[in-house]
């Protein structure tokens, strides 16, 4: 039976493997998040490549360690690249993460494109509570791309999405990870209320899941990335209470994370899986 200590051991191993292998992560992401996402990946030990041109997508996805697709500010050309790269990833066993930013009836075009991307079976679907709940077929009133639903409400509605992906990761006050392979739901605690106030933290989290998925299973990848962010947020909040200083120290701890910090500060709980 899975235990929290065993899961944390696997997270430490995943972190060590990422430092050793420096996975190449292709990011098709939004214009707001691209720079921050690249910096988070570099600070974490991965190698980002922001390749979102449809004419280069197939060849680059083939050589990538992992793929991150984020629908934050999609253009027609980006959408072509997303479809090409997602299909290529599926055909070449490249793990990939789908972040359905803003999914819902208000942003209908991107939502239709998100639905089409599901056919290529992402390794992980990551989003906030409103995005995940709406993607699962529930009617949720969102506030732009921000969530109006709590993560503990959303995870109970998200099981249907396991038909499309190996793992579902939901971020919020506590984070929740659902998986085909586990007989429990993982709750990740930590972080800081300041994290959602920094532009692109959620988007960067999706890319970090992709980086970890290059060196471990989808479930441990999602767990590793969420623990990575939760610890960095918690430790940064101990030193800074304002957004500017918090943002800087948060990035420092993204870079400074190590096995000892994971062992000391990882705060996870196993919940019964819905029947």
From Swiss-Prot:
Cofactor(s) recorded in Swiss-Prot or TrEMBL: Mg(2+)
Binding site for ATP: 126, 171
Tagged with keyword Nucleus: no
Keyword Membrane appears in the UniProt entry: no
GO molecular function, one term: hydroxyethylthiazole kinase activity
Top-level taxon of origin: Bacteria
One Pfam family per UniProt: HK
Reactions the enzyme catalyzes: 5-(2-hydroxyethyl)-4-methylthiazole + ATP = 4-methyl-5-(2-phosphooxyethyl)-thiazole + ADP + H(+)
Residues engaged in binding substrate: 50, 200
EC number: 2.7.1.50
Any Gene Ontology biological process: thiamine biosynthetic process
Keywords from the UniProt entry: ATP-binding, Kinase, Magnesium, Metal-binding, Nucleotide-binding, Thiamine biosynthesis, Transferase
Pathway(s) the chain acts in: Cofactor biosynthesis; thiamine diphosphate biosynthesis; 4-methyl-5-(2-phosphoethyl)-thiazole from 5-(2-hydroxyethyl)-4-methylthiazole: step 1/1
NCBIfam families: PRK09355.1
Function: Catalyzes the phosphorylation of the hydroxyl group of 4-methyl-5-beta-hydroxyethylthiazole (THZ).
Family: Belongs to the Thz kinase family.
The name this protein goes by in its record: Hydroxyethylthiazole kinase
Taxonomic lineage of the native organism: Bacteria, Pseudomonadati, Pseudomonadota, Gammaproteobacteria, Moraxellales
């Amino acid at each position: 039976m899975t235990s929290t200590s065993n899961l944390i051991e696997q997270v430490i191993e995943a972190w060590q493997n990422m430092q050793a292998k420096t996975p190449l992560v292709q990011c098709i992401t939004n214009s707001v998040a691209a720079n921050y996402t690249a910096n988070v990946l570099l600070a974490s030990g991965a190698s980002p490549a922001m390749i979102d041109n449809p004419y280069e997508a197939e060849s680059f996805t083939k050589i990538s360690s992992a793929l991150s697709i984020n629908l934050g500010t999609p253009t027609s050309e980006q959408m072509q690249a997303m479809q090409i790269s997602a299909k290529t990833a599926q055909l070449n066993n490249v793990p990939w993460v789908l972040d359905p930013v803003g999914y819902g009836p208000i942003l209908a075009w991107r939502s239709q494109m998100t639905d089409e991307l599901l056919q290529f079976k992402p390794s992980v679907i990551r989003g906030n509570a409103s995005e995940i709940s709406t993607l699962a077929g529930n009617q949720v009133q969102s506030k732009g791309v921000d969530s109006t639903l709590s993560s503990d409400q959303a995870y109970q509605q998200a099981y249907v999405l396991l038909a499309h992906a190996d793992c579902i990761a939901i971020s919020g006050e506590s984070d929740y990870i659902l998986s085909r392979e586990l007989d429990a739901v993982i709750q990740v605690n930590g972080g800081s209320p300041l994290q959602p106030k920094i532009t692109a933290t959620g988007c960067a989290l999706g890319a970090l899941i992709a980086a970890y998925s290059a060196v471990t299973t989808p479930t441990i990848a999602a767990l590793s990335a969420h623990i990575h962010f939760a610890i960095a947020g918690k430790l940064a909040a101990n030193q800074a209470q304002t957004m500017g200083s918090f943002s800087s120290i948060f990035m420092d701890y993204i870079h400074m994370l190590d096995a000892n910090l994971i062992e000391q500060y990882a705060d996870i709980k196993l919940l019964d899986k819905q029947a």
